[in-house]
């Protein structure tokens, strides 16, 4: 029986173990599948959701298995997988914060290893995860701060690594842990601060910006428990402001800003030095540094405390040498240099015998009066000194005032040979020191001293004698005490000179700093001006080279275009002659001695005007302008139409002709054209004298009229090239007809090289002789301008032609006004 029960028990245990292994295997398989989904962008979000769901419903006994899956990720995996494995540790701490305690050390070690990752996304995930662990595990802290030590110790050891990524990541993780911990142990973080300050002062340390942020977190967490530790930490920040690396300077300024933003009272003694350090790098060459420095200055100026620096060691040593009976903290605080409410130093003069109100007191100013103004050779001065103390020279120098009436009193007594001063003994002790030459028990009643002794010792400033101080009147016993005063004046003179020397050194230091700042600003301005000059020279050279290159390219374009158009013109003329010969036409175009050019648009295309030609009956080859205006008045109608739109070339030629004529009349017109051309050529060449009463302009216009009547566009283009622009030799009606045909060619982008000179002449003559010279009608001018502007907006194969049309349109728009 027992044997059977044992066999059954063993079988049950084996079955349970098998089930457990099966569950673990399924969990690992599920996690691995989800991690594989992270490697693909399309399935990344799905994998993240599955992993978070798995962590949320994870059983307590499966935590170890899950951690083994995410901690053993290979470095060859994609950055998304590595980042998500680190982030899942924080997710696990959020859902199961009570279960991850035993595995905390293993998790932190894995995070420290991941700090070497070259991808910044993975390192940022490490910093974020450490913050989550610190915030969630802080509630399980014991008296020995075991959780905090487990989080901090591996990271602090990693700061000493020689890898830059590890140093920076470990410092930032520590800063996040301290910021996320509700109560960081002060003893631990204080020791950390002392170590990190040494690291920050080490010139060979790499990750200084991260350590600066760590020190900032420690100080804000209360790690600077003593004044010396706080001073050393703040000094390290101030030294970092002078670092060559701008990220270090920016981190230091941000740290100073965040510390000053707390507004704690213990920052008061550090206010002056921090403001001075920030002011020195206020004009940093990097803008982010300048912005953070300006913001830090704003916060530090709001910190309670004095902006002036504490007394220097030199000043303190001078004072301590003459005040052995008192402690330095009581005698040489900043309040010693101010006139307190309870302290009153009263002077009485025998000359005025009047009381001066307290509001009228004015201390002597050392640089206001000229010593040469006091011409008295011997003064009788009676001084009453307090029984317990002697008036400090520093108190006299710092007692600024408003005593205009005292100046007037002294002006009335400048001619007196002797001046008497009395010091009234005071019962209350002033906050000033007692010199070694006079004991506290000495009761000085009166002193008679010659003015030469005061000048020799330096105790009495000539500026002091220029003002009279008055108070209560008292009769005192007079005793000569000149010898003791002479012994004491040398000591007082030394103290005065020492104080003035300290002030002078401070002012000189500030002046030197301001001069260096001005010099730096001047250097920056000079460098900027030189850079601007170099940039202008460089840009000018580039523009010149570009202009030369553009001119060469334009010349090349013109040459190629001329060759192409010349070849096209020869081809078009040959085709036109062949077509006309087949149709029985006797009109044949002739090539001029000049280069005849036409557009490539008329290739393999018969002229639309070759089949519809019109002639004009001419009784003579040369007609006067009067007969011309009478005979052509009806036929030369507005070629642009009443609506302001251009007609087709056929309509223009139809309006020019008076009617369709027979083929014989066309031949006759062709013969007339030939005869006129011969006459014009003979007249222009000088072989034949012009006919009496007929000018050369009439010959030119008659030839154009004959060509217009014939309807031969190739002959017209040849004539345009041969004569060139001669609009000044034609009547307004002929000009309108020619311009109408030229504008039709322009809109069709044909014969551009032939018509552009004529359009240029239109602009030039209108500029020279007025807008109404060629086209008196404003309506026709508007129509012509509209057509040219429309053509300027078209696409030209030749950029030079488009520029020429645009320039003509701009000139005419300035002359004739913008076309509506």
Swiss-Prot record:
GO MF assignments: microtubule binding
Positions with biased composition (Basic and acidic residues): 367-377
Superkingdom of source: Eukaryota
Biased composition, class Low complexity, residue ranges: 304-321
Keywords: Repeat
Species of the source: Arabidopsis thaliana
Gene name linked to the record: TOR1L2
HEAT repeat ranges per the UniProt record: 61-98, 102-139, 146-183, 187-224, 228-265
Pfam families documented for this protein: TOR1L1_C (PF24713), TOR1L1_N (PF24714)
Compositional bias segments (type: Polar residues): 584-613
Cellular component, GO, one term: microtubule
Keyword check for Cell cycle: no
Keyword Oxidoreductase: no
Species lineage: Eukaryota, Viridiplantae, Streptophyta, Embryophyta, Tracheophyta
Location of the region described as Disordered in the Swiss-Prot/TrEMBL record: 304-325, 357-377, 584-644
InterPro entries, sorted: ARM-like, ARM-type_fold, TORTIFOLIA1/SINE1-2
Identification of the protein by name: TORTIFOLIA1-like protein 2
